[in-house]
Amino acid sequence: MKNPFECEVQDGKSLAASAKDALERVCSGKALDSLTRYYSPKFVDHVNGMKFQGLDGVRRSVELYTKILSDLDVVVKEQLTDSDRVTSRFVLSGKSFGKSVHINGITISRFQDGLIVEDWSVTDTLGMLRQLGVWRSALVGLRHWKFL
C-alpha cells in the first residue's frame, strides 16, 4: 500500500520533457489521443484572455488553434524550470488564409503529481495579424471602439 504522505517527485528535466511533449504533440493536434498522459482532468488553461477547463478544455483549445492554422506545428525553442513549474518559449507555425504564419508564444505550466494542472499562455497575436496583412484593420477597429 502506498504511503499517503509520500509523493512522486519529478526533477526539472522530466517536467520540462513532459511540457515539451505536451506542446509539440498534443497542442499541435498530432497526438490528442495521448492528452491524459500529460494533462490532469482538473486542468485549467489561461490563454490570451480565454479560459478552458478539464480535458475537454484541452481539446477545445487545440481545436481553436488548428482551425486558425492548418498544418499546425509547435516547436519548443527554450525552457526554464522552477520547482513545479516549467516555462516554455515556442513557435506555432502553419498556414492561415493561404499564408505561412509563425507565431511566438510563452507558456508557464504548473505540474501536480506528474501532470499539467494549469497553463498560463500568451502568443504574439499582433505579430500574426501583421503577417496576415490585417493589422491595420485591427488598429482601425480598436480606435473606433476607443481602445486606442
Place the predicted regions along the sequence by residue.
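C-terminal and inter-domain tail/linker signature
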Residues: 1-148
